[in-house]
């Protein structure tokens, strides 16, 4: 089964917890803090594996959770960083954040990697909090939570040339003639329902990859006839070969077919019209084909170069392949997404903290609910089993302006304040 779009969940590993410990060697006067830091959580890393062709494996495993870092230890020993979780994907995979729609990665070459969910940093041990006024702190941090998100994987096949046209115009037959590919061929519409790839070699030893794409119909740009699934595979091609049935056996007008398909390409993605297009008049071995071709030429004018062929008899196929190979050599690749500067790639992993850093709402029972990335992360990294950590968290809340904001909302002594699933009393 050919699977070209899936939704999965990924989570980076949490950082290891820091430790509260002290030196106890008899030859070390007054000891001192010796709690080590936790190790960094593992990242979820996507890596391109050229042997894969579809996203089929993700239908059976949709959750990927990386390991957390090792906890800190006594004697100042830091926890070990966990090994990254490597997830193999086929070439041509585009990774998109489901919530924001942001393109996280466009993976095309074998061995290419991208960090999709970063692991959290390790929590600091008590040796990190020692000061002149507090030489033996009873405080350590929990590890930072790993990044988690739902992502959409889309596979857009890697091909130099894409065959487009209405169903049953002879695209699959043409691919089978010019390459070793063996797509399914039959006398009914939508015989081809998945892209088929074939390596084409010309008479002068040039080669390129050609994709036979499922037939398009009017409204494909809006998803009619699975149009979105079919059109996405055209985006990576450098040259579009537009195959038109000149026989007239389907009862359609070749010129109307030509206009309709080009409109679908334009409506789906305007940049598709920037690619050079080769118009192929197929089925020229049929009785009325020559007459239909002349009428077609009169309507499109001399600006459109047309290659009359018969995929069955191979008439005109050689000249067509030479023209396609020439266009590939002179046509640069078309980036399908805006690629961020390499120095800015870290931006994709950062939470946008501009503006409001927390939000206070009130439930029907009077409970104040505090939410926001910064406060929730700080809450998760606090070890509430230690009084000193609790006091530090209270200072952090004041530093963020939460206490003042609660008073402005009318909070009084004894009111219930909720962060995540935990409740505590507000003390003014």
Swiss-Prot record:
Q: Name one GO biological process term.
A: ribosome biogenesis
Cofactor(s) the protein requires to work: Mg(2+)
Q: Which domain of life is it from?
A: Bacteria
Location of the OCT domain? 350-428
Positions of GTP binding: 165-172, 190-194, 212-215, 282-285, 310-312
First-tier enzyme category under EC: hydrolase
UniProt KW keywords = Cytoplasm, GTP-binding, Hydrolase, Magnesium, Metal-binding, Nucleotide-binding
Q: Which GO terms describe its molecular function?
A: GTP binding; GTPase activity; magnesium ion binding
Keyword Phosphoprotein attached:
no
In this chain the OBG-type G domain maps to 159-329
Q: Which InterPro entries match?
A: G_OBG (IPR031167), GTP-bd (IPR006073), GTP-bd_Obg/CgtA (IPR014100), GTP-bd_prot_GTP1/OBG_C_sf (IPR036346), GTP1-OBG_CS (IPR006074), GTP1_OBG_dom (IPR006169), GTP1_OBG_dom_sf (IPR036726), OBG_GTPase (IPR045086)
This protein's record includes keyword Magnesium: yes
Q: What is its EC number?
A: 3.6.5.-
Subcellular localization, as worded in the UniProt entry = Cytoplasm
Where does the chain bind Mg(2+)? 172, 192
State a single Pfam family of this protein.
MMR_HSR1
| Database matches in CDD domains | Obg
Q: Where is the Obg domain?
A: 1-158
Its cellular-component GO annotations read:
cytoplasm
Subunit comment: Monomer.
User: What family is reported?
Assistant: Belongs to the TRAFAC class OBG-HflX-like GTPase superfamily. OBG GTPase family.
Role summary: An essential GTPase which binds GTP, GDP and possibly (p)ppGpp with moderate affinity, with high nucleotide exchange rates and a fairly low GTP hydrolysis rate. Plays a role in control of the cell cycle, stress response, ribosome biogenesis and in those bacteria that undergo differentiation, in morphogenesis control.
Any idea what this protein is called? GTPase Obg
Q: What organism does the record attribute this protein to?
A: Bacillus cereus (strain ATCC 14579 / DSM 31 / CCUG 7414 / JCM 2152 / NBRC 15305 / NCIMB 9373 / NCTC 2599 / NRRL B-3711)
